[in-house]
C-alpha cells in the first residue's frame, strides 16, 4: 500500500544539499532559514494531513480569554507521527534527517518528538523562550525544524530567532510565560544580539 503520492515520497527521499556557508551560518548563530526545502505541492498535502490530525487530537476546549499567556500562544499537539502514517513519512523523512544531521555536524539524528503548533486568531504572542526547558536532554546537539504550512508574512507573526542567543543561559529554566518574555527580552537587549 502506498502511503504518499509518488512525487511527494520521492521528494522526501531526495537530499537537500547544504553549502559550507549555510552550515557555518548555523554553527555560528544556531538557526538558519532554508528556502524551498519542501515544494508547495508537498506543503499543501501535509497541511491537509496535519490539520486533520490536530482537529482530531486537540484537547483544548477553553475560550482564549480563559487561558494564560502560554495557552493563548498556540494550540499544540504532540507526536502526530505516532497517529498518522502520512505525517510519520514527513517527520522521519531522509530529507529532514539529512538536513538536521548536516547542520549539527553529526553522523545521524533521532527524533525526540514532533509538534504541530497552530496559532489562533487573536491568540497573542509567543513569548521569548528557550526550548531546552522542555527537553530533558543533556546534549546541546538538538535542533528544531519549523515548517510553516502556509505563507507567513510578518503581520502573522512568524518565528523569530536571536542570532547567537544559544550562548545565553538566562531563561533556560523558565517555562513559556510572561516572565520568560520579560527576562529573555531583557537579556537580549543587554547582549545586543540581533533578532
Language-model region placement:
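Non-heme Fe(II)-dependent double-stranded beta-helix
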Residues: 1-28, 35-128, 134-137, 174
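Conserved hydrophobic/aromatic beta-strand scaffold that supports enzyme active sites
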Residues: 15, 31-33, 144-148, 158
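Active-site region of the double-stranded beta-helix
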Residues: 106-107, 132, 149-158, 166
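Glycine-rich, charged/polar anion/phosphate-binding loops
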Residues: 130-132, 146-147, 194
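Short, conserved beta-strand element in jelly-roll/cupin
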Residues: 136-154
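Double-stranded beta-helix
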Residues: 154-195
Amino acid at each position: 500500500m502506498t502511503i504518499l503520492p509518488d512525487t511527494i515520497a520521492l521528494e522526501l527521499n531526495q537530499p537537500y544539499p547544504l553549502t559550507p556557508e549555510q552550515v557555518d551560518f548555523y554553527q555560528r548563530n544556531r538557526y538558519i532559514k532554508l528556502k524551498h526545502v519542501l515544494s508547495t505541492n508537498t506543503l499543501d498535502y501535509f497541511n491537509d494531513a496535519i490539520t486533520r490530525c490536530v482537529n482530531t487530537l486537540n484537547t483544548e476546549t477553553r475560550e482564549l480569554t480563559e487561558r494564560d499567556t502560554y495557552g493563548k500562544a498556540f494550540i499544540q499537539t504532540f507526536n502526530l507521527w505516532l497517529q498518522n502514517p502520512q505525517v510519520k513519512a514527513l517527520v522521519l523523512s531522509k530529507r529532514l534527517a539529512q538536513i538536521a544531521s548536516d547542520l549539527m555536524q553529526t553522523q545521524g539524528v533521532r527524533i525526540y518528538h514532533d509538534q504541530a503548533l497552530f496559532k489562533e486568531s487573536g491568540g497573542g504572542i509567543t513569548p521569548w523562550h528557550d526550548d531546552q526547558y522542555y527537553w530533558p536532554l543533556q546534549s546541546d546537539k538538538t535542533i528544531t525544524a519549523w515548517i510553516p504550512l502556509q505563507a507567513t508574512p510578518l503581520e502573522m507573526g512568524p518565528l523569530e530567532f536571536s542570532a547567537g542567543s544559544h550562548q545565553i543561559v538566562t531563561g533556560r529554566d523558565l517555562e513559556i510565560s510572561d516572565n520568560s518574555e520579560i527576562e529573555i527580552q531583557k537579556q537580549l537587549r543587554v547582549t545586543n544580539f540581533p533578532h
